[in-house]
Amino acid sequence: MAAPRRGKASSTVLSSLPLQMLLCLSGTYYALYFLATLLLLVYKSQVFTYPHSCLVLDLTLLFLMGILEAIRLYFGTTGNLMEAEVPLAASLVLTVGSALLSAYFLLWQTLVLRADSALGAPLLALHGLEAVLQVVAIAAFVS
């Protein structure tokens, strides 16, 4: 009979399957959201009177949001699968930042169309659900 090894990980799996599924769904949805929002910005700049400075600001924020989203999804997936609190907490902080940028594109953009609202509301809902599941997963990892 072998003695238990020191430092061996427990056999209990603590990573959250619903969180992992939501992260995958969020990554896919964000790719579509990014392309649709980019096309909507091009449409708005051609059809409507859209100030150049506001267009530059919106494009900059959209690309910043894309970078932030990629980092957030990486940390969230890594933290969940490795059952590590620090990357998951970093993803939670980035989720708040990404939700604020989503709210900007949903509410405070220079020109908000119904298509922007239809695209932004599910993204904001995904961020909210992910934040709740990340808090639950962090609590499970800590205890």
Swiss-Prot record:
**Which terms in the GO cellular component ontology are assigned?**
ciliary transition zone; membrane
What subcellular compartments does it reside in? Membrane; Cell projection, Cilium
Record's Pfam families? Answer: Transmemb_17
What does the record say about its membrane topology?
Multi-pass membrane protein
Gene (UniProt): TMEM80
Q: What is this protein called?
A: Transmembrane protein 80
Q: Which domain of life does this protein belong to? A: Eukaryota
Q: Which UniProt keywords apply?
A: Cell projection, Membrane, Transmembrane, Transmembrane helix
**GO annotation, biological process:** non-motile cilium assembly
Q: Which residues cross the membrane?
A: 22-42, 47-67, 88-108, 122-142
**Organism whose genome encodes this protein:** Bos taurus
Cysteine disulfide partners in this protein: none
